[in-house]
Amino acid sequence: MRLLNRLNQYQRLWQPSAGKPQTVTVSELAERCFCSERHVRTLLRQAQEAGWLEWQAQSGRGKRGQLRFLVTPESLRNAMMEQALETGKQQDVLELAQLAPGELRTLLQPFMGGQWQNDTPTLRIPYYRPLEPLQPGFLPGRAEQHLAGQIFSGLTRFDNNTQRPIGDLAHHWETSTDGLRWDFYLRSTLHWHNGDAVKASHLHQRLLMLLQLPALDQLFISVKRIEVTHPQCLTFFLHRPDYWLAHRLASYCSHLAHPQFPLIGTGPFRLTQFTAELVRLESHDYYHLRHPLLKAVEYWITPPLFEKDLGTSCRHPVQITIGKPEELQRVSQVSSGISLGFCYLTLHKSPRLSLWQARKVISIIHQSGLLQTLEVGENLITASHALLPGWTIPHWQVPDEVKLPKTLTLVYHLPIELHTMAERLQATLAAEGCELTIIFHNAKNWDDTTLQAHADLMMGDRLIGEAPEYTLEQWLRCDPLWPHVFDAPAYAHLQSTLDAVQIMPDEENRFNALKAVFSQLMTDATLTPLFNYHYRISAPPGVNGVRLTPRGWFEFTEAWLPAPSQ
């Protein structure tokens, strides 16, 4: 803030003559700067010592002195920004840049992408919105989920290649023959980000805190109790076998923060700043796995960089650009893929909506070309043909005598593409004689709302990170959507079916059983996927090791910058 005030005062001195020499009294300068004569003399002395201007005072009160400017406010601002970066004051950079929002792109351009600051490799990512606080348990946004995975660790984690759980805070685990006891053996060299040694009691306490959350209690519903059975061992005792347990513990929602300090973890990066304008991560010197190659990663929250009229493809969160938005022609795509996650439609059968009427709605969506012609941005989405690869969408020949209800109600939440989808579906069903009432829930999930209670149709977004089959099991088990899709007996039957699936020790059998559950949901016209996203990551030359993750981000621990040439 001090830099910002000094720049403001310098601009007030400069503006009346646009930088030309001035003959002026100290009193006039004090009035211009909204301060006392004594203070303006201090400002002039400090600015002259810094080499910004020359001030030749005349003896005597009220005498006019000579003021000559040596630098422009623009060059001074840039110098201040560089100085702030070199001293680790990124917040000052953003405050200085906001002085001229029309020039924000030009001002920030030199500081984006990969930079070496004081021999420290730093990656700066411009981002289109403030990040939401990192709360324990489930998080709604992809960026927040990814960030949690960089800051916190779980007892287990998902292998990048196989998508199966492997050791993390626990180096190994053992399961009893009946599947009711799981022993997790902790690494002996674990440290929290604040330098404290990790104790089994810390992790035990945080796990018990997580189980107080309703969604996590539902996720771990088979857990009877958790005990510290040895200073290096945590043991889970179960009511019934749950061969998803290692998967559940590897999911970001089960990652473990310090029991007293919820933003201190054990992950590869520690959180050093979290504001609405800037989020900064620095590598954890005592990380227990492979150390990051970057020292720091920064999210610069700069929404003006992402206005539509700028023509930047990184406006949308599924298209991440690392680097300089003003020079997109120099930024090349380094990784891309189709998301496993999807936007979906669920249908609540009732006296208002029969099975064949629901099937007709789904058939209209998938067979009319509606999804292929949504106006949501070029190459942003692709129509879904399967829930997961190999889990194909059924097709029906709907009898001609099946007519849609006169009225239906649709409730949906973000992302923004579902605005367009809802409007197109409304128009399409109107042509079939069905009036569709649309209700928008302005959130990224179904938490904290009862709007679904009155809905025949519901649309939302199902993010899928690692282990897609397990993620869908977790979705059915924990999402508050499903009690509104089914009546009470059907929902209880669904949960019992999931319980029967989880007791299967063989992974392939579990996957096949879960596939059968979702195939039945699609056959019953309870669920259909709508479209998937094209994930893209672009980076300028010199940012290496960028690998697309299943959430559409990139693994911070693998990115690296070559040393600057001498």
Where are these regions (language model features)?
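Aromatic- and charge-enriched surface segment that lines or borders ligand/interaction sites
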Residues: 19-22, 41-43, 140, 172-215
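Surface-exposed binding/hinge segments that line
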Residues: 66, 216-260, 266-273
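N-terminal lobe/hinge region of extracytoplasmic solute-binding protein
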Residues: 126-175
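A bilobed periplasmic-binding-protein/Venus flytrap-type ligand-binding module shared by bacterial periplasmic
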Residues: 282-285, 336-360, 373
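Ligand-site clamp/hinge motif
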Residues: 286-329
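Periplasmic-binding protein-like
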Residues: 350-392, 520-526
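Extracytoplasmic/peripheral linker and loop segments enriched in polar/acidic and small residues
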Residues: 475-540
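Long beta-strand-rich cores associated with HINT superfamily self-processing modules
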Residues: 539-566
